[in-house]
Amino acid sequence: MAFGSMNSGDDSPMSDINVTPLVDVMLVLLIVFMITMPVLTHSIPLELPTASEQTNKQDKQPKDPLRLTIDANGGYYVGGDSASKVEIGEVESRLKAAKEQNENVIVAIAADKAVEYDYVNKALEAARQAGITKIGFVTETKAQ
């Protein structure tokens, strides 16, 4: 047994560790953490927006995006189908002008399937330089 009398004459050290104080401390720490944890999870102050069932009439109308077309040879066309071919610098200036006219302008990039990605990347960079954040890509759906 680990507890012997003082007069036993056995000079060997006590081999068992008393774990009762360790368990007591751990249980107290567990209780403290359990109490403080809910307070810590809700410490971020947020003001969440409220939603209403009404929508603006303006939101119901579809927004006509500004079309940026890139042909197979890397030519850029800003606007409708009858638009003339422009260089990438002119693309950026036209996108800036469109952004000044309408703050929420949407750009739809229609790139040919065979165009190199570098041309698409330049168009995306021009839109970023113009401050446009709403960009979409035009694709065709497969006929079933």
From Swiss-Prot:
Membrane topology: Single-pass type II membrane protein
Cysteines paired by S-S bonds: none
GO molecular function term, any single one: transmembrane transporter activity
Tagged with keyword Glycoprotein: no
Annotated transmembrane regions: 19-39
GO biological process: protein transport
Periplasmic side stretches: 40-144
Assigned keywords, A-Z: Cell inner membrane, Cell membrane, Membrane, Protein transport, Transmembrane, Transmembrane helix, Transport
Subunit and interaction comment: The accessory proteins ExbB and ExbD seem to form a complex with TonB.
Name of the featured protein: Biopolymer transport protein ExbD
